[in-house]
Structures are given as C-alpha cells and as structure tokens.
C-alpha cells in the first residue's frame, strides 16, 4: 500500500528520523495559513510547496515550487490544486492534485540517496546509498553503478552499526555530518522494520549548510500482507490515487493489476497468470490486466472479476485460463455465465479449462447459449485470441 509523502514523514518523525517541518493543505487558503505559520517559526526566507500524488518526478513536472511569501504560496496552491500532474511515473493520463505539503526551506549543501527495500534475489533486506541524490536510483544503478553501494542486512542480526558507518563512509562524510548520517540510517531501518514497510526511500537525503541531516523527500510503501498488524495505517490509504478497477477488485479480494493492452485475462495462480500474459504477447496480443482469482474463487468473485475486465474500454477480447486444482472449474464457469448474462457479451471470450471438474464446466458453458470459444491448450488459446482480434 502506498501513502503520500507527508504521511510517510509523519511516521518517520516518530522513529527519530529528521524531516523538515511541514503542514498539509487541501485548499489554497489552508496553504497560505500553513506558510504564515512556517515563516514565523523559521529563519529561511523560502518555503516549498509540493504536490502530493503517488508518483515520482513531481519536480520536473512543476509539482514542486519555492515561495517567498504566504501570498505567493496562495497563488501557487490555487494553480496547483485541481490540476493534473503528468510525470514519467503517472503515464499520459496523469494524476489530479488534491492536496499539498507546505514545507520549510532548506539551505542545501549536499544531496544523497538512502533507501531500504527487500532484495528478492537474496531474500534479505538491502540498504542502498548513493552520492547521486535526487536522481532515479534505477538510472544510477545502470549508468554509474560505482556511485551506488548495496549492503545486505541479515534477517536475524538486523542492521549493524558497522554497516551504517560503512554507508556514511561511502558518502564521503566526516565529523558531525558522519555521526548524524549514521544516526539517520539507523533510525530509518528501525522505522522500516517496525512498520513492515516494503520500501523506505529517502531521495534526496540532504546535508544542510548548518550541518543537519534531513529527509527532503520520503517514499514509504507498506507490505499489504502485514497490514493486519497495522490497522491504523489503513486510514492513510488514499483511494483517489489508485486505479478504480484495482480498488473495486480489492473489495472482492481479487489480485488485479491494470495494464495498457487490449486482451483481458482471468487466471488462477500468479505463475499461470504471468505465463498466460507472456503467451498472449508472443501470439501478437497485449495483456490488458493481471487478474488472479486465487485458489478459493467462488462464482461470485469470478463474476466480479469478469465484470471488472469488461468495464475496461480498452479490452477487445478476454482469455479465461483456469487450471483446476483447489479451485473447481465448474465454479469458474458458473461465475462467467452469470456475469456474461448480467453484463452482456460484446467481445470474443476464449476459454481454456483443465483440471478439477473441467468436463462439467465445459458442459455448462456449451449449454449456456453464450458465444464462447473453447481452447485445448494455452498456446492454442493465445492464438485464438490473436485470431479474434484480427
């Protein structure tokens, strides 16, 4: 689950991670009042107005601006709230700005990158630091890997003091700046583990001219599978930032991810879903979604998934690929039939069913009177999808 920058900073602050003073605003007037409060409390002659959306690249898109007075903050906020911000992470449709973070300005001397996430290749958390703060870390890793240090963290031992010092040495810091950075990294790891985050990224981490170490930006994502331990974090969820199809799917406990293709997919099992998407691509099509109905799918959840797929206007054909192990094929067939009758079929639907009660399911589909195309294998199913689209 993703949260906004200001929410992430509020959480990090509780664990001793240094972050600038900031106030969230939902209107231009609230932004002005926030600026008045910050100017009274700080010596810096500027504040920063930052659009709050679940995407990076806001600065280049005009979503981060400096202001020297409350009136200037008001004017910026009036232009920014309600506008659509398009970044390299939002896609061409962009995201509407509904809230802002008004934050104290910083006298920046140096910028770095610090992040902690899970390295799936080693099944360990990894601390990453780079001297190239403010840049996309993927770009740094690809173009200048010598400027990125990765430190594996043993799951039983946790982050060790020498590892935090190693990271600070890599950044070329000395004296109080070195000590403060070690303290910062240690606090960040403490927060990362305590809240069950999947990523805690500070980009940039800044050293101010006064010697302070501060998180100028913060990206915190939670492990959704651990949210049962942090029910208060569910209140931080901003549904308006999420894809409406994915929100609807989550209500039925469906694993759905929207893509930009034209072939809707309904599959049971993440591995089979990935293989199905690959086969569609190889056959000349393009997947419109990832949808795993899971092993305990009921006719109701299948029906809901089918409706969600058909609600996507980009979908021109649907491939249903079910291997019945735990989930019974007749359950899936029942859900498809009910959904098709309620929504109406106006596109080709290719069905491949194998496993538990596959013959019963096929008979149900044959007797339904619906225009469904049967396939006897995954490759054949993908080819029939491509034929239906041509």
From Swiss-Prot:
Enzyme Commission no: 6.2.1.5
Binding residues annotated for ATP, in chain numbering: 50, 57-59, 103, 106, 111
Reaction(s) this enzyme catalyzes, per UniProt: succinate + ATP + CoA = succinyl-CoA + ADP + phosphate; GTP + succinate + CoA = succinyl-CoA + GDP + phosphate
Domain ATP-grasp residues, every copy: 9-248
One GO CC term, this protein: cytosol
Cofactor: Mg(2+)
Residues reported to bind substrate: 268, 325-327
Pathway this chain belongs to: Carbohydrate metabolism; tricarboxylic acid cycle; succinate from succinyl-CoA (ligase route): step 1/1
Gene3D superfamilies: ATP-grasp fold, A domain, ATP-grasp fold, B domain, Succinyl-CoA synthetase domains
A Pfam family that the UniProt record links to this protein: Ligase_CoA
Enzyme class: ligase
Biological process per Gene Ontology, one example term: succinyl-CoA metabolic process
Domain of life: Bacteria
Family: Belongs to the succinate/malate CoA ligase beta subunit family.
UniProt-listed PANTHER family: SUCCINATE--COA LIGASE [GDP-FORMING] SUBUNIT BETA, MITOCHONDRIAL, SUCCINYL-COA SYNTHETASE BETA CHAIN
Protein name: Succinate--CoA ligase [ADP-forming] subunit beta
Lineage, opening ranks: Bacteria, Pseudomonadati, Chlorobiota, Chlorobiia, Chlorobiales
Gene that encodes the chain: sucC
């Amino acid at each position: 689950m993703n949260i906004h920058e200001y929410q992430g900073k509020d959480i990090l602050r509780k664990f001793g991670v240094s972050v600038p003073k900031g106030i969230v605003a939902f209107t231009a007037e609230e932004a002005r009042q926030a600026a008045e409060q910050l100017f009274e409390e700080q010596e810096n002659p500027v504040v920063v107005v930052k659009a709050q959306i679940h995407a990076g690249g806001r600065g280049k898109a005009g979503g981060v601006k400096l202001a020297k007075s409350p009136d200037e903050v008001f004017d910026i906020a009036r232009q920014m709230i309600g506008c659509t911000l398009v970044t390299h992470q939002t896609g061409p449709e962009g995201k509407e700005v509904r809230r802002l973070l008004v934050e104290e300005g910083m006298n920046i001397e140096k910028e770095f990158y610090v992040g902690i996430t899970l390295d799936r290749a080693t099944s360990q958390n990894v601390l990453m630091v780079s001297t190239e703060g403010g840049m996309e870390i993927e770009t740094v890793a690809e173009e200048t890997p010598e400027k990125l240090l990765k430190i594996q963290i043993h799951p039983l031992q946790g982050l060790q003091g020498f590892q935090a010092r190693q990271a600070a040495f890599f950044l070329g810091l000395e004296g109080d700046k070195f000590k403060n950075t070690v303290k910062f990294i240690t606090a960040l790891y403490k927060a990362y583990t305590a809240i069950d985050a999947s990523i805690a990224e500070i980009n940039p981490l800044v050293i101010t001219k006064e010697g302070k170490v501060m998180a100028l930006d913060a990206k915190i994502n939670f492990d959704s599978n651990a949210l049962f331990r942090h029910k208060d974090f569910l209140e931080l969820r901003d549904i308006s930032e999420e894809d409406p199809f994915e929100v609807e799917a989550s209500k039925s406990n469906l694993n759905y991810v929207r893509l930009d293709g034209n072939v809707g997919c309904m599959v049971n099992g993440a591995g089979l879903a990935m293989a199905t998407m690959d086969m569609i691509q190889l056959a000349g099509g393009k997947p419109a979604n990832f949808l795993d109905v899971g092993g305990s799918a009921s006719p109701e959840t299948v029906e809901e998934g089918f409706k969600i797929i058909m609600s996507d206007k980009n979908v021109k054909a649907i491939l249903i690929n079910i291997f019945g192990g735990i989930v019974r094929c007749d359950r899936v067939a029942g859900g498809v039939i009910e959904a098709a009758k309620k929504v109406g079929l106006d596109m080709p639907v290719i069905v491949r069913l194998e496993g538990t009660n596959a013959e019963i399911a096929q008979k149900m589909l044959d007797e339904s009177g619906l225009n469904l195309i049967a396939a006897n294998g995954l490759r054949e199913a993908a080819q029939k999808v491509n034929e239906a689209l041509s």
